[in-house]
Structure formats: C-alpha cells, structure tokens
Amino acid sequence: MAPYGDLIRNKTGLMLSPFFPAAKMAWLLSNTEGAKERDPEDLCLGTIDSWLIYRMTRGKAFKTDYSNASRTQLFNIHTLSWDEELYELFGVSAKSLAQVCDSNSLFGMTDLDGYFDHEIPIHSAAGDSHAALFGQGCHSAGMIKTTYGTGSSIMMNTGMECVSSRHGLVTSLAWGLDGQVNYVLEGNINYTGAVMTWLKDELHLISSPAESEAFAKAANPVDKTVLIPAFSGLSAPYWSDTAKAVIYGMTRTTGKNEIVRAALESIALQIQAVLEAMEKDSSICIKELRVDGGPTRNSYLMQLQSDLSKLDVAVAGIEELSAMGAAYMAGIGAGILNQSELFSEEGRTLYSPQMTEEERKEKIGNWNESIRLVCGATVQ
C-alpha cells in the first residue's frame, strides 16, 4: 500500500496509516468468514456514528456526516464523495458505505428502544474534535482550539479553503452545515496528559496529575532539563517512528521538581510546534487559542502555553465541549438555534503572555535542539 501514499494523501488529506478505518475495513473483509462472498449491499462498513445511527433507527438509516467520512481514507475531500479509486484500492464496495450528510441533517428518528414514548429526531453527527471545535465557537477561518487529554488535538478552521499541509499536519473536513462545508488543519499529539500518568504510575514522582503544578512552580528556574516524551515515536508535526524518549540536559542539581516541570513543558512545547506549523501552512496569523480538557485546570501549563505561543489562551468554562458542539449542531438543524448567537465567553478563564522574549526563545531553542538529537527532525 505504501506506493499509494501520495495518492491517498492528495485525495483525503490524511497520511497512509492503519489508524484510519479504510485499512481496518480491508482487514475485516479479508478475515471475516463469508464477508467477501456476501452481496455488498448486505454489509454496512462505517465509523461509530453510522453504527449508532443504524442501531438507534432500528436499521432504517445508515448515514454518516462529512467530518466522520473524511477520516475514513475512502472519502475525497475535494469532490465531497466516496472515491472509487480509493475504495477499490482497499477492496471496499461503495454499496457497503454509509450515506454522507451534513452534520446537522435529519439522520433519522428514534425512541431509543422504547425509552421515549414517541420518536424524536436525530439531528447531529460529528467527530469528537470537530464537535469540540464547533462547541468552542471556532466557526470562522483562522480560529483554533486545542483539546488536552491523554493526547491532544490541535485544530484550525480554514473556512471553505482546503489547505494542504507541508509541515506535518493533516487536512480534513470540519463539518457540513446547511449545504456548506468547512475545512480544518489538525495536528494530533500522542503523549500530553499521558506524560503525567507516566510520572505517577512508573516513576512515582507525583501521586496525582494535579500535584504537578506545585512541583513545577517550585523547580529551579536556572535548570534547563528537557523531556521528550517519544514513548511511541513522535507524531505531529515531526512524524518519527524511530525517536526514543529522553530526558536531556540534567545536572547534579536536577531533581523531582525539575523533571516534573520538564514533563509539563513537553506538553506545551509539542503544542507550540503544531501551532507554528499551522501558521506556516495556512499563512493565517493566529489571534487566540481556545482550549478545553482536564489538563487545562493546571494554571502553570496554561500560562506557559500562553507565553510560548504569545497568544491569549482562553480556557472554556464547560468541560464537555464535544457534546456541546454536537448539541449546537442539532439545535441548528432543528431550527431552534441560530449559529450567530451560540458562543458565549461567560465562564472562560483567560491567560495572557508574560514571559520575556529571550526566555521564550531559549525554551523553544532547547526543545528544538533536543528534537534534533532524538529524531533528526528539521526544526526551524
């Protein structure tokens, strides 16, 4: 499949990877007894949203939305349709794929197997990060959000322009609303919150991730220790499968506080690298970073993110922004909400840059030098 990597990337915006559903579908068809002999119209191959819609409607609807379809590696994000060359390449029939709809379409009706006394409309379907982008109010080109979790998703709305990445990001569809699609650039990072779990479970340096803030604030400001959390290689924007995790630059006085701080800094520095790649790819000057997820409760991390990016970082007042975004889309689809009136700044916490430019450049420079040492990545 490797020789088709460029073809797949050009049509789908995604790098060839078994992470995406196309490879999984091909495997299922080859390894499920009788699957290849069945009429393709008797098979349903799709993402989790299409399965849920199928079950909730008792098999009456097999549908998906643009955001989920665009992550299958079978969907052409330029023609906005299943791509014959791609699904034949993976041995999948178009007859087995879900109908692609706007994210705020009427997907079907359900009573949730009798939970409701009457059927209600299913008016929304969207990918997790895509829904969070919408829930954050990032509805226009140039707006950007980061969801912090075990890993992190950084996503920029590029509006109706499909921007091809030259700096290690993927291009995808944000959503389709009322007949109009928006595109995104996205960078996914494997180890962010998971670094704190590693400190707790394997090194026993902290008893909970919440403790990391106090340790980081108590660290020696002169210490330059850098932690590269490449436990399974490095993802966006570096994409190195061979990189290994390292703690670099320790001295005799480096202790627990300094290592914990380096781990926290690795989260912010990885995200900063993706933000820089997004500005280069899009030629858009980012104005603000909207953030959500559990680690955003760490004020040290949020202030550092603001300092490194030289951006105001706005922490959402609502944790479940993916659910909120999907609910907003459903409300628009049902005609009870107006998109222009959705987003509110109420409850947000705002962090503004405070770090000197000299200190900022030194931290980013030390990080980039460490990246070069572990994977030979070209870093500006």
Show which residues each predicted segment covers:
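Active-site core segments that coordinate phosphate-bearing ligands/cofactors
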Residues: M1-F62, Q73-L89, T110-D292, T296-Q380
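Short acidic capping loops at alpha-helix termini that bridge into adjacent secondary structure
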Residues: K95-Q99, C285-E288
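Nucleotide/phosphate-binding loop and acidic/charged catalytic motifs
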Residues: K63-A69
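Gly/charged, well-structured mid-domain segments that form the phosphate/adenylate-handling core
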Residues: S103-L106
